[in-house]
Amino acid sequence: MRSDMIKKGFDKAPHRSLLKATGLKDEDFDKPFIAICNSFIEIIPGHKHLNEFGKLVKEAVRAAGMVPFEFNTIGVDDGIAMGHIGMRYSLPSREIIADSVETVVNAHWFDGMICIPNCDKITPGMMMAALRINIPTVFVSGGPMAAGKTSKGEVVDLSSVFEGVGAYQSGKISEEELKDIEDHGCPSCGSCSGMFTANSMNCLCEVLGLALPGNGSILAIDPRREELIKQAAEKLKILIERDIKPRDIVTEEAIDDAFALDMAMGGSTNTVLHTLALAQEAGLDYDMNRIDAVSRRVPHLCKVSPASNWHMEDIDRAGGISAILKEMSRKEGVLHLDRITATGQTLRENIAHAEIQDKEVIHSLENPHSEEGGLRILKGNLAKDGAVIKSGATEVKRFEGPCVIFNSQDEALAGIMLGKVKKGDVVVIRYEGPRGGPGMPEMLAPTSAIAGMGLGADVALLTDGRFSGASRGISVGHISPEAAAGGTIALLEQGDIVCIDVEERLLEVRVSDEELEKRKKGWKRPEPKVKTGWLGRYAQMVTSANTGAVLKIPNFD
């Protein structure tokens, strides 16, 4: 066993003595040591219940004849961090999480790991660590939150609350109505109830094969979560016995399938960023062109909030992720069904008995929302290395208009609230990329303000930053190269005409190459917004969004 490094041999007497101080007995040294990587944090509603989850996981691990050791990671609640400097720490926290898990697991030579994530950056951070460490691992997330209902019976979620701010600001609803939405938008523990980033990543974790069937859709408050925990411990023991590791599971084909599900469900654009980062950790050569190829062959079968009024509980009721995958498998070439997963079985075996229970929620191949996926990769002279749009969250497929430029999210939000943006405009928010932000903050507040003011179909928004999974409308993010790297977005001037063509996958500014080259010669990179602390270091090390915004390792040659 891997853990023999710290528990076998006469020279490990000091190690065993320390381990006995934690409560271990001599007989425990013949059992696998299992890391329970938890993320219990009281300020994050998606993680508030994970303390109890951790106890259940440890009980299940002991029942399976193994020895559990629980530790915790940090986390950031993107909703609470939204709209201020806290959001700049969100994406960088992914790297800290990955590094901290690597540190604890490799320092103590665990034989296997069960990860308990739930929200936005915690799930991908732990997944990156699992691929980096590469010991048998199973994920069990905390589960989605239920949708809420206002006093009038209207179904609401966190996206409704953000959009309610814009609606109140523009006089569309009263303060009392806003308070009603606020009070009911987040009714329980769990990851926010729509197809936002957290749920998108937990669903992708399931199809990648790192989590068990049901992981993405079973609600946090559903007793079936406890059964999932028991299964996770049992399956982990099998993975250890068969020496099946994350890199055996997360192959190029598995990433294809993850993006295929993403396209079928119209997931968060953040999945592109995080899954590209996973590919980097797995040592795979996977780029945005391959994502685009997946998008072209996968139909859009589900619309979940913010693209509709359906929520994760509806997906679960309609058959869950397995039912979506089973339907997708009917189309040749969409999925790789014979690859291994954390169940110890193939994807084909995992979904064999799944069926769609409600075709209003999960559409059939014969009745898709669209013939192509709910996310699209755009390219053009404004995004030579690519950009991402959640095409399933807007009915507008082509938009052209003059750009209104803001050099920060705060500046943009103030401008939107002051009425500086009108119908037909293209809002540009730049210098908010991985390096320029720093931290590539999400633009939920501006997109929600635009939607809440009734301009969601009449105003486009472009950024080198990110969008929350709760964002909707004509929102193009992850523009690469970013402004801080001298990308074309940095060269735009007020009033330049920008064209977004979703069907043709184009993002262009109507300015000649000669004029852009002239502007570039006169461009100067702004001073970094942050020069000290973690964000200062992050800004110096982070790479582009089109490679997952991972950190580059300095060249010591």
Curated annotation (Swiss-Prot):
One Gene Ontology cellular component annotation held by this UniProt entry: cytosol
Keyword Chloroplast: no
Catalytic activity annotation: (2R)-2,3-dihydroxy-3-methylbutanoate = 3-methyl-2-oxobutanoate + H2O; (2R,3R)-2,3-dihydroxy-3-methylpentanoate = (S)-3-methyl-2-oxopentanoate + H2O
Gene Ontology molecular functions: 2 iron, 2 sulfur cluster binding; dihydroxy-acid dehydratase activity; magnesium ion binding
Protein name: Dihydroxy-acid dehydratase
EC number: 4.2.1.9
HAMAP family, A to Z: IlvD
Cofactor details (free text): Binds 1 [2Fe-2S] cluster per subunit. This cluster acts as a Lewis acid cofactor.
Disulfide topology: none
Subunit annotation: Homodimer.
Alphabetized UniProt keyword annotations: 2Fe-2S, Amino-acid biosynthesis, Branched-chain amino acid biosynthesis, Iron, Iron-sulfur, Lyase, Magnesium, Metal-binding
